[in-house]
Amino acid sequence: MNITLSWRHGRRRGLAALFSAAALVAGSVVATAAPAQAADESITVNFSVAGGSPTYRASGWIYGMTENGANPPDNYFTDVKFRYMRAGGAQLDSPGGWVSGKYDRRWNATRAQLLRTQSLGGQFVLLVHDLWGADGYPISRFPGDNGNWADYDAFLTRLIDDVRATGAPAQGNTVQWDLWNEPNITLFWNRPQSQYFEMWKRAYQRIRAAFPSHLIVGPSFAGVPSTGGWWTQYLDYVKANNVVPDIVSWHSLPGDPVANVATANTTLDSRGIAHARPYQINEYGASNEQNPADGAWYIARLERAGADGLRANWAGGSNLHNDLANLLTHNSSGQYQPKGEWWVYRFYGSQTGQIASVTPSSNYDAFATKTSGTAKILLGGGRTTGNIAVNLQRLDTTSGIVQNNQVRVLVERIPYNNGGAVTGPVTVSNTVATLSGNSTTINLPHTAVDDTFTITLLPPGGSTPSPSPSPSPSSTPSPSPDSSPTPPVGGACSATIETTNSWPGGFQSTVTVRAGSAPVDGWTVKWTWPSGQSISSLWNGTQSVSGSSVTVRNADYNGSIAAGSSTTFGFTANGSAATPTATCTSP
């Protein structure tokens, strides 16, 4: 799919509402002015003002998981404290979906991604319109054409039954229902507004009756809240008809979540519409804002606004269903590699304890946390370059960091690398600072507008933290014949462990599970660690541990292996690298 939209010119994060088709339209163009240059600014972090614990509200994506739900590997999700996946089979069999008689493939992909999201501890946001087929292609019909709702009712019956068959109970917030994406633009809703309102009411009532505790999301508006026009017309309708969504949503492409939330509060409060749950900005980050600096800025602003965020996805075709919404890339061998912005989310995912207060500047904001023995600051920008003075105040209110009026300051830069793979943050400085009045100032030379910085505070005598590195490029584990050890006979299976990367105190391994001369339907792999190793993260399987013994069973999506073929799962582990002998059994 290759549709180019016309966008309003403006600087990044201009507050005007912009039309969007993120995640669903490849080749969209955002025209922006060049970023400002050399604007020295300062921000302040006050550690005496502490908020709650981080909830990683910005760690969600729209699409970014393979069609079968198998990839990317688990660690790329768990390392960033993944919270949300928003999907519904867009672009599969295009034109596809219910209206084209091709619902099944889109539903099968949605089901696989839903189950994988839940296995990773995330919340799945179901895009109903994509399953219908309204993903940017001209389609033959919309719900309620010519006053006939029979076809849409049949579609909802099928979808409700399919969701129920996944095991999602009527009670329990296991699925969020996003009824229609960007209904205020003709790319996705090419019918009168009144017909959309009737569709909303019918879908809302059907889903509420079938799943009383599932949350309904909307309107997923193409733009940001405003005090008039389509936004307020929608609010007036849902209020008058008692079909107010559980979670109010919009898109920030670009936009400022803090300003958007203030406007949303004004428009909902004036109508007496309760909004007890956080707003959901379920597409944020225009295509030219997907870099470490802008990504970190959106994280800081979402946290400041108290809104949940799902990062937009500007890929198309098969790339839409992969690469964690463009946070990852592939090398020539098809192995996953993280981009610079993935490292931003990884640092964000490592921030624990209590949230500290930050006073932003006009172009920079930050997210800061403190816990015993460390404090961390993720800096966001993306609009200008120049020196950034980060004023750290009331360090006496931290725990286990300041010793003899000194603190160690580790500054790292996360490079954009023109959107290519990034092996990790780059150390800028690692020094011991002497405090003055329980404070110190760190000056950051911001010369590349798309790069960003992190600051880690440690006790002065402490060593530089060395978290387990991200797994080196990891292969796509899909069942395929290869030239590994001779397969076993009959319906049996074999398993081979291979160390693919190692570092001080840890390693990564891939386990190949191979069927014999007959297909395998379900497998279990077991081994025993020789010297105290332990798994820190595992993907494409489900593990259980008893002492040094490890048992891994297949995931829902990779238990069936054709005769003579194989699948893989992988893990990272603590301890010295080891390749114990593994056994495989099949029911």
What are these regions (language model features)?
Residues V80-P245, S249-D256:
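Substrate-binding cleft and catalytic face of glycoside hydrolase catalytic domains
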Residues S362-Y416, P504, S509-S517, D521:
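Carbohydrate-binding surface patches
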Residues E289-K376, G380-G382:
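Aromatic/acidic polysaccharide-binding cleft in carbohydrate-active enzymes
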Residues D246-P292, S350:
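Glycoside hydrolase catalytic-domain groove-lining segments
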Residues D450-D451, L458-P587:
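Extracellular low-complexity, O-glycosylation-prone Ser/Thr/Pro/Gly-rich "stalks"
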Residues N2-A38:
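Secretory targeting and sorting signals
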Residues A39-A90:
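Boundary/entry segment of secreted carbohydrate-active catalytic domains
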Residues R383-P473, S531-I535, T542-T551, N558-I561:
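C-terminal beta-sandwich/jelly-roll accessory domains of carbohydrate-active enzymes
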